[in-house]
C-alpha cells in the first residue's frame, strides 16, 4: 500500500478521463481512421485499466466517474460494431491485423462492464462478440470446445491476442453459466500448457506466435524474436484465472515457473 504509487495511479486515471472526446471515445485514432490496426486493442486496455483500478480505489466519486466513462466508451462501440445486416461493422473486421483476433479481445472488459452495471445491453454485446468466434476465418471458441486441434494449428496463431480472447470467454462463462464456454476455456488452457509452454514458462518460439514451442524450444536456430514477455504475463494471468476456475494445481505450477 505505497501511498505515492496509489496517488500516481489516481492521477493517471484522472488524466485518462480527460482524454474522452465528445463521442465518449478514449482512443488514439481519429473518428475517420478508427477501427483499424490496434484501435480496439488499445481501447480494451483503457477499460481494463479503469476496472482493475476500481478494485483498489477509495474514492467513490472517482469510481462512479470511471463507470460512467466506460459506459459511454462501450455505448459508442455498440452503436458502430455489430452484424452487417444492421448496417454495422463486424467486430472481426475492426482490424486488418490477425483476422480481427486483437479486436475481438475487447470481450473481457465488455463482460466486466456488464458485471459492474448489470445492464443487459453489455451482455448482449458480449454475446455478439462471442458469436463471431474471435476471427473472420474460423471460430476459435468452437475449435477449443471440440478439442481436436492444438492452438498452434489454428488458422490464426497470435499467442498474446488469442489468450486474451479466451480470458474474455472465461468472464463470459462466469456471467452466463454456459457450460460449453467453460469447457472451451479449460480445454484451450490444457492444450496450450501441453504443446506451447516452454521450460521457462513462456510460449511462441517463432516471433510472437504459437508454434508447438514445447518441442521447438530445443531448436538451435535462433530467429531473433521469441517467447515475448507479453505472452508470458498474459499466460500468468490466464493461469491464475484457470486456477480459480478449476482448482487444478498444474496452472499454479505454470504460473510460478513463468514468474521465476
What is the meaning of each model-derived region?
Residues 1-260:
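Glycan-recognition and catalytic cores of secretory/periplasmic carbohydrate-active enzymes
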